[in-house]
Amino acid sequence: MASPTEISVNQLSRLIGTPDCPRIIDVRIADDFDADPRLIPSAARHSHTDIATLTADLQGQRVVVSCAKGLKLSQGSAAILRDLGVIAETLEGGHVGWVKSELPLVPVAKIPARNNAGRTVWVTRQRPKIDRIACPWLIRRFVDPNAQFLFVAPSQVENVAQYFDATPFDIEGVFWSHQNEKCSFDTFLDEFGLHSDALDRLAKIVRGADTN
């Protein structure tokens, strides 16, 4: 049974992708992370030794801290945050518990490098249609809640990507775009391992509206 400062895997999974999803912080040590370099959707990785430095950014938000098994690292980190005025819980069973429940996990290698502010930066064509609206929604809800999106003239997408260290998407000739009959939203689902009944249904709607 979860303690008053724990949240179960099932409870957290129901919040993922919703406006009520807490900020999720992964504090696994390097060996545990290297053994499974994937994150719970929307999670960000930080060292337990630096947890207090996150306080200002986390004030007023609900936080869930996860380590390998939900023991010393997450419980100690969450306790520090609570002492500093942050509403913080730990994930019961930690990363291992999430994996055992066979829930989606995002491969870190697929996430673009973050800027100095800790945000991924993406760029695409201005005047977005459904695919270029759905993709930012997906990224902010399931990959990087603080992601930055730049909408520029079509002819300047790749130039902006180069000069602003942004990742281009939904244009011809780039990785994060249409693949055969699939739209860009499908590519994000595939690469980030985010398939679920709900997101697959949404992908069908996006694909139908985008390719007709």
What is the predicted role of each segment?
Residues 1-23, 27-64, 69-130, 135-136, ...:
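Rhodanese-like catalytic fold shared by cysteine-dependent sulfurtransferases
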Residues 201-212:
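An accessory alpha-helical subdomain
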Residues 27, 148-158:
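A short beta-strand-loop structural module common to alpha/beta enzyme folds
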